[in-house]
Design a protein with these regions (language model features):
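The tetratricopeptide repeat
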Residues: 79, 138-139
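TPR/TPR-like (Sel1-like) alpha-helical repeat modules
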Residues: 112-135
Length: 149
């Protein structure tokens, strides 16, 4: 009887550990180790700070914003804010125009990256507030700062 109770308790404990839900889409699966393109792009950008890694990260953010998935069907928290901030960084348009691949440039479909990135950056910050109103305290000052420039 004791063995049955122990086995039953163990079965309940182990069955409650599995989590199957994905509230958000964190990018495409890129390899057999279950890393995503997003994870790889963020890692590469923050470790190398190269122009190519910035272009790859911008394209991954663009994909995540245009293809939200998961159970909620919305962009994960912070993605729009970080994407918008990167788009509004002063060097981003020039870096993108000089270092992005043809395929990456086609995603943005524009020759004037300065105007496009500025408009899109501000709209991404606004979208972050729309999706996650609690972020307004942090995002509103950024919108104000970049709108005045």
């Amino acid at each position: 009887m004791k063995k049955l109770i122990v086995l039953l308790g163990l079965a309940v404990a182990l069955s409650s550990c599995e989590v199957k839900s994905n509230l958000y889409n964190w990018g495409n699966k890129s390899n057999s180790k279950n890393a995503t393109e997003y994870e790889s792009s963020v890692y590469n950008y923050y470790h190398s700070q190269s122009p190519e890694s910035l272009c790859a990260l911008l394209c991954e953010y663009e994909y995540m914003v245009t293809h939200p998935g998961g159970e909620r069907g919305v962009v994960p928290p912070g993605i729009c804010a970080e994407y918008g901030y990167l788009l509004l960084s002063p060097d981003t348009p020039q870096i993108f125009s000089e270092h992005a691949t043809k395929r990456q440039k086609e995603r943005f479909n524009s020759g004037d990256y300065s105007a496009t990135f500025r408009e899109k950056g501000i709209s991404m910050l606004q979208k972050e507030i729309e999706l996650y109103p609690e972020s307004a305290v942090f995002i509103q000052p950024l919108i104000k700062k970049f709108s005045q420039q």
